[in-house]
């Protein structure tokens, strides 16, 4: 049986997964109803009707199907479809509540939130209903921990299924011996940090509303603000608190688990992040004569894919913008809420290049052995790192070409294309409400494939392609 072949049982298994995901997203859609009622807004039905419909529809679909012999490529197909479905459902309340939004605009906004990219088409968010602002923040918060991670707790009747759902969303590491244990630990860490973030920001002088939304967008490294300014607070304490949240986002959940359990850790990704952050922050501060705290905040925001800024990025020099593009492309650590290629893959590529150089200059009799921390660098690991890096660069390049074809400045197009693909959210203003539909769709696709690290989307396309070929031959 070919990897791209889908039998009726395979399709039923995928539909079972999607049914559970649709049910969960439907339930999530009901949550903003509480905010709508509390603030006496007229958006209540805009959340209630789609929320109830998809909760029931997903429940029925899940009950009508059963998971049978699911493989990793099946859950990858389900994962790729899940993020699309989440955005299509999440867009409905936005479309119904924002008068000037087309449905494509709403899908763009929802995809940006779910994937924690943080791009927005809304020119004045401060006039939006509170329930809509909460929905944008809530989608980012859920998207940060992962739709499939949450769904695995509901859907998984076995550790195997849970692990397949977990890995299909571009995750590999285990914190606990079992997949279910790992997922539960991740969720509890995420909730704990969210509560701490809200509490600390509230004690710093923010209202509970601002503290809640800022924490949800900060801890998820989403960065979609409830203010017209990316980060409207000049207070040093608040900048530091959000900065700590963003730094937390660049560290993997396994590192957080070791921190919380008092175990020693010496993670190479964390070392890299701290060194590169300090180095590039100093360069930008000196080159563009901006305060070091603002430079540091912007660099951390770019690396963690949060997207908050305290300065106008468009005013930075070409060197600084290039360094930010580099940070956005590489992203944070594996097993984090951040986007990008991931630090560990970049380090693997550097080690592989070092190996090639050593092989040339060392004597033929020399035995060369490369490793990264406790990980031996074999062919499979190196190949995967190069493939993902190439696909990210290719996706960013193709997205930039579309923007350039629409008449946008090449430098701005490349910057925003990398920001889309790496789910960053820092923008030079390429995609706005006035952008042609094709430009918005390009942004949607770039955010989608970037969140899944591209491979599951390619598996989906390959599956659909070969399925279509077989149907045409009949």
UniProtKB/Swiss-Prot annotation:
Keyword annotations of the record: Cell membrane, Ion transport, Membrane, Transmembrane, Transmembrane helix, Transport
Transmembrane segments: 17-39, 44-61, 81-103, 144-166, 186-208, 239-256, 268-286, 319-341, 385-407, 444-466
InterPro entries: Cat_transpt
An individual GO BP term: potassium ion transmembrane transport
Family matches, as Pfam families: TrkH
Coiled coil location: none
Bilayer disposition of the protein: Multi-pass membrane protein
Cellular component GO terms, alphabetical: plasma membrane
Locations listed in the record: Cell membrane
GO-annotated molecular function: potassium ion transmembrane transporter activity
Main localization category: membrane
Entry similarity comment: Belongs to the TrkH potassium transport family.
Name of the protein described by the UniProt record: Uncharacterized cation transporter MJ1485
Organism (species): Methanocaldococcus jannaschii (strain ATCC 43067 / DSM 2661 / JAL-1 / JCM 10045 / NBRC 100440)
């Amino acid at each position: 049986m070919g990897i791209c072949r889908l039998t009726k049982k395979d399709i039923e298994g995928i539909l079972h997964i999607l049914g559970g995901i649709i049910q969960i997203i439907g339930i999530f859609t009901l949550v903003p109803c509480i905010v709508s009622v509390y603030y006496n807004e007229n958006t209540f039905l805009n959340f209630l009707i789609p929320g109830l419909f998809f909760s029931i529809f997903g429940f029925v679909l899940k009950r009508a199907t059963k998971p049978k012999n699911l493989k990793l490529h099946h859950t990858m197909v389900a994962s790729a479809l899940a993020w699309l479905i989440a955005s299509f459902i999440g867009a409905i309340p936005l479309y119904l509540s924002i008068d000037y939004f087309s449905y494509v605009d709403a899908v763009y906004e929802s995809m940006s939130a779910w994937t924690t990219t943080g791009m927005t088409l809304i020119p004045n968010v401060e006039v939006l209903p509170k329930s809509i602002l909460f929905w944008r923040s809530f989608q980012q918060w859920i998207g940060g921990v992962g739709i499939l991670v949450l769904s695995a707790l509901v859907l998984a009747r076995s550790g195997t299924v849970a692990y397949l759902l977990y890995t299909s969303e571009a995750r590999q590491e285990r914190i606990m011996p079992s997949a279910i244990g790992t997922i539960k630990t991740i969720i509890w860490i995420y909730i704990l940090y969210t509560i701490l973030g809200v509490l600390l920001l509230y004690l710093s002088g923010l209202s509970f509303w601002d503290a809640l939304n800022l924490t949800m967008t900060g801890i998820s490294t989403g960065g979609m603000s409830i203010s017209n300014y990316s980060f409207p607070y000049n207070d040093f304490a608040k900048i530091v608190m959000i900065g700590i949240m963003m730094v937390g986002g660049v560290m993997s959940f396994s590192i957080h688990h070791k921190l919380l359990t008092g175990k020693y850790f010496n993670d190479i990704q964390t070392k890299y992040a701290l060194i590169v952050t300090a180095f590039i922050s100093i360069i930008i501060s000196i080159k563009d004569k901006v305060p070091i705290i603002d430079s540091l905040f912007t660099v951390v925001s770019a690396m963690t894919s949060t997207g908050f800024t305290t300065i106008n990025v468009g005013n930075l020099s070409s060197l600084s913008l290039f360094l930010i593009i580099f940070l956005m492309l590489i992203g944070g650590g594996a097993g984090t809420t951040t986007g990008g290629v991931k630090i560990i893959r970049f380090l693997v590529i550097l080690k592989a290049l070092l190996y090639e150089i050593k092989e040339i200059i060392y004597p033929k009799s020399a035995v060369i052995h490369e490793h990264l921390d406790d990980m031996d660098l074999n062919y499979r690991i190196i190949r995967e790192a190069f493939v993902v890096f190439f696909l990210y660069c290719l996706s960013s390049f193709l997205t930039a070409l579309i923007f350039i074809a629409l008449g946008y400045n090449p430098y701005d197009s490349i910057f925003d294309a990398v920001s889309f693909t790496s789910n960053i959210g820092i923008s030079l203003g390429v995609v706005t409400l006035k952008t042609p539909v094709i430009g918005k769709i390009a942004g949607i696709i770039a955010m989608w494939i970037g969140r899944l690290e591209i491979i599951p989307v390619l598996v989906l396309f390959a599956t659909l392609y070969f399925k279509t070929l077989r149907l045409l031959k009949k």
